[in-house]
Amino acid sequence: MRRTLFILALAAVVAVAAGATALGATHVSTVDPTGFSARVDNPWFPLQPGTTYVYTGTKDGKPARDVLQVTHRTATIDGAPCVVVKDRLYLSGRLEERTTDWYTQDRKGNVWYFGEQTSSALDKSGKPVTTGTWKAGVDGAKPGIYMFANPRVGQQAQQEFYKGQAEDHFQVLSLRSPVTVPYVSSKNALLTKEWTPLEPGVLDHKLYVRGIGTVLEEAVKGGTERLALVSVHRGA
């Protein structure tokens, strides 16, 4: 019951945030853990099990390669069934970070982010750095909307919340943004901006192509990261 009430409250907060834009009246969604599915087929962020996305570019001034794999595994996080996504980031050919992400979708088609388990380069004591790791329902961590079912310009939401560790937000900027990456070109990409109060002055843009998902991520302020989609392999 605690989980259900919490997610209802969070949905209301997200709805109010979206309604506070020029889109019109606010509304409250009545979602709960039983209303989620590990089948994520939102056209702007589809997560079909067996699919592998490969991105290349630069990060922190180094050649970067990011491999994102949608597994056939599911996990129950704070009562909600989530698809398990593995993410491996290589810098200058060396594995820099491993991340396990948990996503789920509500009945309306919104994609929710329920947490991540992160392990990056070793610290001075030889232990892997796990900063940014969080799981909905643990130690006050809360899930957030990662992608709207029907994105509209001006919509915004908090994607995650674990105080002092994970506080990303995003806002829809355009539904007709041109983009060209090695894998695809489109004149109707979805453009968003992302930011976090934990890194003031840092702003990222992401572009999504319908039916594919994320095709480009780049820092536009306070960073040098740029990762573009180069291949998509859809396995069994």
Segments from the language model and where they lie:
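Bacterial N-terminal signal peptides that target proteins for export
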Residues: 1-9
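Conserved functional acidic sites
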Residues: 25-236
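C-terminal region of N-terminal signal peptides and the immediate post-cleavage residues
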Residues: 16-26
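Bacterial N-terminal signal peptides
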Residues: 8-18
